[in-house]
Amino acid sequence: MNIIDELEWRGAVNQQTDEEGLRKLVEEKKISLYCGVDPTGDSMHIGHLIPFMMMKRFQLAGHHPVILIGGATGTIGDPSGRQSERQLQTLEVVQHNVDALTAQMKKLFDFGGNSEVKMVNNYDWTHEINIIEFLRDYGKNFSINSMLAKDIVASRLDTGISFTEFTYQILQAMDFHHLYKKEDVQLQIGGSDQWGNITSGLDLIRKLEGHEAKVFGLTIPLLLKSDGTKFGKSAGGAVWLDPEKTTPFEFYQFWVNTDDRDVVKYLKYFTFLTKERIDELAVKVETEPHKREAQKVLAEEMTKFVHGEEALLQAVKITAALFSGDIKSLTADEIEQGFKEMPTFQSSKETKNIVEWLVDLGIEPSRRQAREDINNGAISMNGEKVTDVGTDVTVENSFDGRFIIIRKGKKNYSLVKLG
């Protein structure tokens, strides 16, 4: 199947400006296409990842992706999907975010050697345009009537929209025109909320370059979970690509915990597995859901893609240790990842009796209860049961002098930080 057929099979096509024309174009030649992201933060989350997964598919099919980081548009703010104005960021913050997103993109796409992938920053060409040029060369080609009719603007008319955000669609259209002229880009990909911005770009190119210009737009559907909520959030909030914000272990766990009703859809959307392999996993979901094989494959594929093989192996190791309770083989860094969301306590490094120590920290409510739990085998320290109420807790008990893990009962873990 060609790339458009594959995207449709994967459920990744929402709207196309000219399905027949685009299908014919990609069958005739390898095209250049682009997708952009504004540096509104210093990390993408997995919701941002969706259109770039489609760009990666085009790359693997031999096409030439252009990744746009919005160093200019990021200073303005995209009104799409918002009910209120964005808070303007300083140029210093925007540049910091540009650098961070650029580094993330370099991990996802191969920019080395003879790679056909390019990364551009729209600040490089936008900052040279003065206000007179903007109004004469570009503004003249936009009708206020058509701009007001765009969903991204119409939805804000009651609550209000600034002239700054109102002109965002012109800036994005300018990007498409610039890339069409300089990089021969013929297709823009974006989320479903970008339809108005994309069609503005098509209109501008045709007005400036002639109606025979072969340019196209394609949007990705809004991805919803089976319960109707928006994809991309965990109980702790957004799932980030930055390992400092969402650890590889947490990232892995997010995918492992995917609902049976969603997992096949996610395998199609997010992995590069073949149709045959995904069909096999779909059968396993129906016949052996308790094994959660599809979820494990999804988690492995995504963690490896975003964080690499080493981080995946670490996440799998932490998961296995937590499941079995055998945590002795974990390193201090793995402990920090795996127990990040557990109840956390602070302790000095001085030697102390286990009973006194548990009560002082607040893990046990009283000395009597602490002694009773120890005598009943309900207390484990770093994966080993504590059986003697006379046991002393020392730095030697810790992981690298930093952490001690207490388990009370079967599943109640506590992380104790020494310092």
Curated annotation (Swiss-Prot):
Enzyme class, spelled out: ligase
Task: Provide the E.C. number(s) assigned to this enzyme.
Answer: 6.1.1.1
| Pfam families in the record | SYY_C-terminal (PF22421), tRNA-synt_1b (PF00579)
Main localization, broad class: cytoplasm
Q: Where in the cell is it found?
A: Cytoplasm
Place the motif 'HIGH' region on the sequence. Answer: 39-48
Q: What is this protein called?
A: Tyrosine--tRNA ligase 2
